[in-house]
């Protein structure tokens, strides 16, 4: 099992070398590069990766073009260029609720993972404030909503697929039910049925919403939304109760946010290059009890951190090209032709991501640098190959080693890799015209013939692969005892007879030596 970090840059239309940039997928724990995608650049939040490994896809919205580039894992050049109704600024994918677990844990299934597979829905936001929703397996345009007045900066689905959340430059954040967005085959031909309202409209911010994140709860009642804005605020909402829980006020504008997988803290990237940790729990000094911070619409001002207990500083280090007192690490990261142009520009932490176990923080900035930091020590543990423009997306995913390594004999015919062309007009309401392109997987094994011992052994091996962070699979080999009880008894009897014989000989020898010793003493007397 390995964790792969995917990152991509925004690109610069004024830079002729911008098209030479690569989007990369690299391991967190070792130096292996899993995949690279040529001529890939996207607006902030304008790229999305369906997963890591053979059969997965990268979907990129072309900057300032009504075009969508689709890459296959293991191929550097795009497979498809799909025209769109208008240029998109952000993208989001979601798996179907009934197939999500099958896709993630296919090794435990009685069917093999199909070579052709696509997510369920693709959502995109545009500069005009519209939200588009496509069904990828058919290419049907299910919904177009005029959700905002200005550019949509970010769209995200909840992990369960129940809600779609969008943030915009108009300082609003809207929450939509996914079923409302895709309810086109309900048999009602009235156009007013499409004019539904959002599940929740958030208007608490005063400036543009730059980023948002949803937690991954075990039950939907614990679903929370974290939004950040250029008005220096981090706001936490309960989606089910539609209540604002806590507002954190910081000293700088916030550009990015990520939440701890266990809900212990939130990490925000600021416009001055700092990353602040905002703990959601603390220990009461009077009772020594762990208590939650905030709630009940509290407004909390985050104080400065002079001791740097909750602050990451590495993005603030700006090194000039002719500096001599710098480390080799930062020389490599800042070896660009436009160092002098960027010298007076502030450094923004544009994107944040967190590892599966919540121990490593991955961050990208406006200079194209990407770091992996240890959350406990707040020190940089790894750096990736820098890009020549601001980082627009960082995504972390996990997969087995054999899935990440693409072999030459695992290539699929191009026509079987392509997804359907995305429609530019709304689909009709006739359900009989709804056609899907799906691959029915073949059976991998018969679970009914598997006994408990084999199942337990397989689970033990899967647990070992999950905990193994290297590319070497090692385990202690157990040698079975193939001897029978009668053979063991005979072997023990032979050993006992040999020991008895040796003891008898040793005792007789001792008696002889004792007699000789007595004779010598008598002769001397």
UniProtKB/Swiss-Prot annotation:
Compartmental location: Nucleus
PROSITE patterns reported for this sequence: WD_REPEATS_2, WD_REPEATS_REGION
Keywords: Nucleus, Repeat, Ribosome biogenesis, rRNA processing, WD repeat
Domain of life: Eukaryota
One of the record's GO cellular component terms: nuclear pre-replicative complex
A Pfam family it matches: WD40
Ranges for the WD repeats: 105-144, 147-186, 204-247, 326-374
Protein name: Pre-rRNA-processing protein IPI3
Family label: Belongs to the WD repeat IPI3/WDR18 family.
GO biological process: DNA-templated DNA replication; rRNA processing
SMART domains tied to this protein: WD40
